[in-house]
Amino acid sequence: MARRAAGGAPPSARAAAAVPLRPRPHSRGPGLLPLPLLLLLGAARAGALEIQRRFPSPTPTNNFALDGTAGTVYLAAVNRLYQLSSANLSLEAEATVGPVPDSPLCHAPQLPQASCEHPRRLTDNYNKILQLDPGQGLVVACGSIYQGLCQLRRRGNISALAVSFPPAAPTAEPVTVFPSMLNVAANHPNASTVGLVLPPTSGTGGSRLLVGATYTGFGSAFFPRNRSLEDHRFENTPEIAIRSLDARGDLAKLFTFDLNPSDDNILKIKQGAKEQHKLGFVRAFLHPAVPPHSAQPYAYLALNSEARAGDKDSQARSLLARICLPRGAGGDAKKLTESYIQLGLQCAGGAGRGDLYSRLVSVFPAREQFFAVFERPQGAPGARNAPAALCAFRFDDVQAAIRAARTACFVEPAPDVVAVLDSVVQGTGPACESKRNIQLQPEQLDCGAAHLQHPLTILQPLRASPVFRAPGLTAVAVASANNYTAVFLGTATGRLLKISLNESMQVVSRRVLTVAYGEPVHHVMQFDPMDPGYLYLMTSHQMARVKVAACEVHSTCGDCVGAADAYCGWCTLETRCTLQQDCTNSSQPHFWTSASEGPSRCPAMTVLPSEIDVHRDYTGMILQISGSLPSLSGMEMACDYGNGVRTVARVPGPAYDHQIAYCNLLPRAQFPSFPAGQDHVTVEMSVRVKGHNIVSANFTIYDCSRIGQVYPHTACTSCLSTQWPCSWCIQLHSCVSNQSQCQDSPNPTSPQDCPQILPSPLAPVPTGGSQDILVPLTKATFFHGSSLECSFGLEESFEAVWANNSLVRCNQVVLHTTQKSQVFPLSLKLKGPPDRFLDSPNPMTVVVYNCAMGSPDCSQCLGREDLGHLCVWNDGCRLRGPLQPLPGTCPAPEIRAIEPLSGPLDGGTLLTIRGRNLGRRLSDVAHGVWIGSVACEPLADRYTVSEEIVCATGPAAGAFSDVVTVNVSKEGRSREQFSYVLPTVHSLEPSMGPKAGGTRITIHGSDLNVGSMLQVLVNDTDPCTDLTRTATSITCTVPGGTLPSPVPVCVRFESRGCVHGNLTFWYMQNPVITAISPGRSPVSGGRTITVAGERFHMVQNVSMAVHHIGREPTFCKVLNSTLITCPSPGALSNASAPVDFFINGRAYADEAAEELLDPAEAQRGSRFRLDYLPNPQFSTAKREKWIKHHPGEPLTLVIHKEQDSLGLESHEYHIKIGQVSCDIQIISDRVIHCSVNESLGTAEGQLPITIQVGNFNQTIATLQLGGSETAIVVSIVICSVLLLLSVVALFVFCTKSRRAERYWQKTLLQMEEMESQIREEIRKGFAELQTDMTDLTKELNRSQGIPFLEYKHFVTRTFFPKCSSLYEERYVLPSKTLNSQGGSPPQETHPLLGEWNIPEHCRPSMEEGISLFSSLLNNKHFLIVFVHALEQQKDFAVRDRCSLASLLTIALHGKLEYYTSIMKELLVDLIDASAAKNPKLMLRRTESVVEKMLTNWMSICMYGCLRETVGEPFFLLLCAIKQQINKGSIDAITGKARYTLNEEWLLRENIEAKPRNLNVSFQGCGMDSLSVRAMDTDTLTQVKEKILEAFCKNVPYSQWPRAEDVDLEWFASSTQSYVLRDLDDTSVVEDGRKKLNTLAHYKIPEGASLAMSLTDKKDSTLGRVKDLDTEKYFHLVLPTDELVEPKKSHRQSHRKKVLPEIYLTRLLSTKGTLQKFLDDLFKAILSIREDKPPLAVKYFFDFLEEQAEKRGISDPDTLHIWKTNSLPLRFWVNILKNPQFVFDIEKTDHIDACLSVIAQAFIDACSISDLQLGKDSPTNKLLYAKEIPEYRKTVQRYYKQIQDMTPLSEQEMNAHLAEESRKYQNEFNTNVAMAEIYKYAKRYRPQIMAALEANPTARRTQLQHKFEQVVALMENNIYECYSEA
């Protein structure tokens, strides 16, 4: 016990007295709870304990002492003494007491007459005794140096000596000092010492010091092994002694043995017996601490004896020794040996010696008992996790044993009971002897006498059974409170346990607190003498003040009392959990309920009546109140109903156990409203006393008349089934609470008597078919003859005719559906308002089917016969006519794909077969699926009619491959073959890992990727997770194991037999982390933290994370099996924070700690801590920012460092000048010297000087490089030479300039010629384009028109732009069949457009929750608080804000006027925020919820304008761009084209392309052949795309086939035809690259005949052409032409560099061609139609002007910017860049690039700043620079026209918005949007609640309560339901 043996301080007298224990019934073997059961005793929350203050010590701590009167804590550490304030542990004074030069073989230097020949080495001073002597105002501090020298320091100022000892000898009378006066404590760090200040004896006037010290002299393990015989310990330091401590008397007697002869006041083991009696002292204490008058006080010593087994002196290893002290003040002192007696202590269970805890660790005395911690030694003393136990002993038992022993020694000798300690020098004799006729007095029985043998040892130990067991216990402190015993236990891992024991000494609760992880708790703990609510304890490097209870963490009486905390109880009238002294009047009965009384004593209340009819009048409420409550009679009371509604309450008379109170019911006008869908409301009522609601109960208000509204289709049965006393009035067709309203009619009295429909099965009916439906009724006599209607929901009603008393006929019912089948509920309704239905408890339904829907092939169509659908296949699924024959057979099955393609021989593989006509029903294919000769059994639950079969393969005798066949009267065969193979495994790596799991293992073998399901099992039961596999390997993560052992590993295929392959994985002991260093880091992180431990060779990955303040975790590096290095994570602030390590993906946990804690605590326990400190700060020595340096001279930098506590080492500083390192030469706390050993480059005149520490980087100055005088001379010479060279160069220049002039003239002629060519090209291109576009316009008018997207798809793509591409790829699937009608468009399955997919059993609760949430969102106060609360969260990203805005838009789409008002309020907040900063930046981006809401609002309001005005010119512009691009060559791989608007997409080569008109027929299209124009440079894919465009120009793009889905065949002659492909065997290879085939490559002539057909086999030679590797393929130009340039001639090279820029003129050509279409588009956008003015734009622009005026913003530029940011840039630019939001078209990358140029021109037109253009400006801006001024005028004119429009009133705008809402109602599923919004509400629930609480309006309207109701409804089901959905 290294730390434990270092000595300890006993508790002060006040500490022991302040926490007395109440009497306990004696029990030698109290019942124990096993550890697993203890883990279930409550939640082990650290909340029951709280560290109030800490004081860290840089050196290990040794002892502490408390001065309660002065409020001071004295702390002794190695080489340091500290004086701390007890309240906050702040430092008041300190003293340095080491290290000093010393040798254990030398006398103390204070002994002047002694000399020493041995060398003295610098030695640390370990404190051994720290005791307070308040009577003399002293602090006694004894250390391990100088043979255990003691110092007397001043109480109140530890830094000052009170007495100088040995004293300075006066010249007249020198003081003789003996070694025994100096050798007080043990002189070795690990040797134990205890001390105790004893009160003065009579006549001496001074205190005394009792010392127990382990022998460290010759022969002990502590004596230096140098064969020296100089032992200063034996003679001078006895094991036990009482020394003089009279500092006011003769100093020559200080520390001398007190009595004379001195031998009688010491106890010293004989030299020869020391080996058999090695004493280790634990604690010394007084008992009683404050003895009553004339009572006998005792001093006790608790110690361990390492006696050999069988030695007669001491059989026990744990001992308790007792010494008598003088009675009363000034009593005569007893001789130590006279009264000394010792007895053994034994803590053992009932399991024999194996359950014996033999070593005493810690002792704490109470009033009648003392508690002790024992451990069972395992290996070395002080093992961290040694088994330990707590035992309790009674002082009365000690007293009885001592009296019996003395009687047995002196009166009736019994050698087996007691013996004389003959091993002691001061003993009287070897054995007890009978004193005849002696009568021992009580004092002699207790304390012995001089004439009796002494000292004595009792041979039979005092035994006790453990009351608690746990590993690693090191300390104990005990207090009694409220019929409980509170026991505090320190552990070796730095934790503090608090357990509560009841009167039977059984554990009833347990709490754990981590004080300092990894630092053992010192074995002495003490309560604050002045306030026992605090406990002081010490770990190896910290002093802590711990609050013994944190009662405030419990908020209810049940939690408070149920926690079974000895200190906590419920303060009834203050409704809080408190300590007893913190509760007013707690000393009076029933004001404070302790935990020992149990939860049954908590206040409770019953309300009578508990159910209230809303229509009845009640005089008042009776309240029955029970539980522990003071009498409420005479107190001011009220009944609190919430929302500030209270009524007067009164108690008629005094009572306690059950009190009756009376209370007025709240007024009817203040009844809470009934929730939607409920016939009742629950009201909570509380009794309020003195401002606190002390007890609460619920009662219910119900309304019978609401039952019919809540359950309209079961009104009568629900009324008579409800729990309320309701009656059904058949005459009024209403539920009533008072039957007197309708007594004339025969009213039903039970649900069975209600008139109701008796459901009968109906055959499915086809859509549109007319039929009569008979509806049977029961108990309907009252309604016979009444006018009824048959209702089928959704306003589908038909005439109902009475057939008889119990039968109604629905005439000529015609129902329609566009679905495959639809269920219509049938109900009977009484004609006339309001809606009144006959009950249908079991709804009757009609199934309507549509053969034309949902059956794309024959098998699916005919398979519907099983559902009763009369369908027949005839070129489609049709309704079978009455005369049509029964359906025949379908075509043979068509297998399109199978997966997987292989499986194991054992079978069991789930083979998926996809195709068409795969059977009408399961029975068709039940025995018809085969793999060769092996059957495959279809699975019923996985079968999809006609489309998919999932079957389980059978076993095969051997490996083979064959096709899969499906036989359904006809046989279908797969193209691929399925293979049976035999997988094998042969090795595993790594073969070992920690038992915590997480190791990634790789299994090697062959054919491991077979089958459909794979499992890797560890130990044949535990699955390996995260599997990835290839044909030869499987990688997975092993689970955790239980015991370190080898376990088999096998691979299971298809849940069949396991393939072992002799694979074994060894579970080894987990890696252990023992320490991290350093323990401090700069807040920026990056400091290298060294992690020490064991078994790191099994670690594959490790990361380090910091709790609470940490940033991202960092990844560590494993150096070897014992060391890991980690960069410290960055932190958010300066603080101490817990650190976690994740080893192999598993959180590291100390196994010993996990045994101690319950599972919840083990997960939260912080293992290690990092102290984050501010980043270090540096500066140059003189704090200058510029340092001048001459190159070539030596450079040394002196850097000043601000003082910090990081303790950085020299290797952690990295100093650089530019990129050159500065080597550190000298480093101290304040200054760093570094020098540069290499020359600094002069390319740069200035170099930064930077210092890096971890991730922190600071530039402290700049080094300016200056030249010397030599450099100046060299510079002058160089300048002269340069001047001469300049003259020569001027002459050469003049000569060449004349040549350049001639060349320039020639170039001008070429440019004029080029300009002429460009003009001609533009003219011709424009004419051709106009012709083509005219034809296109005519086509549009003839065909279906522009392919606009439906409104709902426009909204989803605009609102959720990030997902639009996913929708296009995932949901819009191209059809492979093309007909002239184009087919029905495929549906985008966006979640907002479909059903709310949740399981039916969850639907009622969730729909109710969503309904309530919808009502909240329709509350303006809630919604605005909700939005602001979310936007204030740092992790609520921009993407989340935009998503929330769009979801709100969908949810409120039906109330656009309300949505607009919300948007305006949020905009006002945004304007206020922007106006305070820079108003011109408002609405510049979309970073807030309201900005995205504005975008969506504009999209909704401008959709009509977009479709009716802008759509056509925009579509024509897109067509024109595509036509123009297609007129020239387009490189299929790079995408660059001859004609474009974007420079980056310009093909800078003069590649001549000749047009080819091709006659093409398209098989299966139903159209004649067409003439298609293509270029001879086009690839075959480009030709296919142009052909598809020609045939499908009147069909939306989503329904086009793709180029890879069709084959193109050229009929060269009547006998020859070729399938044309981009790549084939004829492809040309140039420079190692294949060139894509073109029309010119195949030499296809003008007018050639081609045929195109759909194919199921895609061209596998290449995918998307753009994705091809440019290193292998090219089309028109070689991408790496520039790389071969050096090989060409200079002339060719020059041409390459210059000529490409000439092709920029083609941009002008393309621009000129498209100019008319662009002008038309901009005109449509920026003009106002008189018949349809833009009302939304006018309304919003007026709103902006109004807000600007309110804030005094008169700058017209600001308003212009606001308007531009609101409409043109926010809406129109988005549309211009994303035409796929509006049209069903293809947006190619090239068209996208051109649209970017056009959008930029539009942006520039809306800007008010002048364009700063020059020769270096991008061409995208230069292209339209000339048109921008005219466009700007158009924009300003548009804004002016809007301003001049007649202002709109709020009513007009609301009407317009309501019309927009109505126009597109029911387009979206708002429930889905609500559910998505709720996810945000759930995620930020605490913040939203806090915001609602802080908002007065929300608080007044109880919005937070309603929000909690939403959460309660949703949280019951939402995750379960979503997981099932």
Curated annotation (Swiss-Prot):
CDD domains: IPT_plexin_repeat1, IPT_plexin_repeat2, IPT_plexin_repeat3, RasGAP_plexin_D1, Sema_plexin_D1. Detected in embryonic heart and vascular endothelium, brain, dorsal root ganglia, adrenal gland, lung mesenchyme, small intestine and in the ossification centers of vertebral bodies. Keywords: Angiogenesis, Cell membrane, Cell projection, Developmental protein, Disulfide bond, Glycoprotein, Membrane, Receptor, Repeat, Signal, Transmembrane, Transmembrane helix. Disulfide bonds join C106-C116, C142-C150, C324-C447, C347-C391, C551-C568, C557-C602, C560-C577, C571-C583, C639-C663. Residues 1-21 have a biased composition (Low complexity). Disruption phenotype: Neonate lethality, due to defects in the development of the heart outflow tract and in aortic arch patterning, plus defects in peripheral vasculature. Mice also display skeletal defects, but these may be caused by defects in the embryonic vasculature. Residues 49-1271 are extracellular. The chain crosses the membrane at residues 1272-1292. One of its GO terms (molecular function) is semaphorin receptor activity. It is found in: Cell membrane; Cell projection, Lamellipodium membrane. Residues 893-977, 983-1065, 1071-1145 form the IPT/TIG domain. Glycans are attached at N157, N226, N483, N967, N1120. GO terms for biological process: angiogenesis; aorta development; branching involved in blood vessel morphogenesis; cardiac septum development; coronary vasculature development; dichotomous subdivision of terminal units involved in salivary gland branching; endothelial cell migration; kidney development. Residues 1293-1925 are cytoplasmic. The keyword Membrane applies. It is a single-pass membrane protein. Residues 1-48 form the signal peptide. GO terms for cellular component: axon; cell body; glutamatergic synapse; lamellipodium membrane; plasma membrane. Residues 49-548 form the Sema domain. InterPro entries: Ig-like_fold, Ig_E-set, IPT_dom, Plexin, Plexin-D1_Sema, Plexin_cytoplasmic_RasGAP_dom, Plexin_RBD, Plexin_repeat. Interacts with NRP1 and SEMA4A. Interacts with SH3BP1; they dissociate upon SEMA3E binding to PLXND1 allowing SH3BP1 to transduce downstream signal through RAC1 inactivation. This is Plexin-D1. It comes from Mus musculus (Mouse). The gene is Plxnd1.
